[in-house]
Regions:
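Short histidine-centered beta-strand/loop micro-motifs
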Residues: 17-20, 66, 72, 165-166, ...
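Small beta-barrel nucleic-acid-binding modules, principally OB-folds
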Residues: 52-67, 190-202
């Protein structure tokens, strides 16, 4: 099974006050499909536990033509396109009920050993010869710099509800923090055209708080989410808004 598709109907809790799907829940869906597909391909959570390793999401680049709305029926498709060294590339497409592409994106995952927390060569741990790779959309995954100067910052509490099965703050929470900062600054509805994410280190509940630093220039929004004293970057995120 080189591709996995799953149908969704957008629920009320997945939408913002304007009836559009929250970015956080879009990334929730991506995470769930990635996990489910990895299980089916024999490289998922349970197999990783047996080999004392884990997949860690490192990057996303998502291009949004249109966000689904409340009660919309969509299909999300995911597939692997490449394994290189310790990394695997996984891509996503979101279709509307008529088969039109609403959203497309690419993600990079790193296989790490749980004992030393160091990257592992994927081909040395798993037999990937039977995994059929699909052609890549060639969406770039660029390295992102930290926000050094910023025009907005806010301290946010971490909650027990933010923690996932891996015992750290779920990746989608960082997206939600950026959505909050966007609305705090714009005070109105906004449309996102593109999101790039560079996860640097996993926050845990004992961190208690994170600092969200934002730089807004026209339709370009840069975020760095750090430890409360700015000593550690947890995530760097760029969001581009539509005109």
């Amino acid at each position: 099974m080189s591709k996995l598709q799953e149908k969704f109907e957008i629920k009320t809790y997945q939408c913002n006050e304007f009836g559009k799907m929250k970015l956080r829940h879009l990334f929730d869906c991506f995470q769930e499909l990635a996990s489910d597909h990895a299980d089916r391909l024999g490289v998922g959570y349970e197999e990783c536990l047996k080999k004392n390793c884990a997949w860690v999401c490192a990057k996303y680049h998502v291009i949004i033509d249109k966000l689904p709305k409340f009660k919309d029926k969509i299909t999300i498709e995911t597939y692997p396109s490449k394994f290189v060294g310790p990394t695997g590339i996984r891509e996503f497409k979101v279709f509307d009920d008529n088969g039109n592409i609403l959203i497309k994106g690419v993600s990079q995952w790193v296989l790490i050993g749980l004992e030393r927390l160091r990257p592992l060569i994927v081909q040395n741990i798993f037999d990937c010869s039977k995994i059929e790779l699909e052609e890549s959309m060639e969406i770039p995954l660029d390295k992102m710099g930290s926000v050094e100067s910023y025009n907005f910052e806010e301290m946010k509490d971490l909650r027990y509800d933010d923690v996932d099965v891996n015992h750290h703050i779920n990746n989608a929470i960082y997206i939600s923090l950026c959505e909050d900062a966007l609305f705090e600054n714009l005070k109105q509805e906004f449309d996102v055209s593109e999101i790039s994410v560079d996860f640097k280190k996993s926050a845990v509940l004992s961190d208690k708080k994170v600092l969200v630093k934002s730089l807004f220039v026209d339709k370009n929004c840069d975020f760095t989410i750090t430890k409360d004293d700015s000593s550690v970057d947890f995530a760097r995120i760029n969001i581009k808004l539509k005109p």
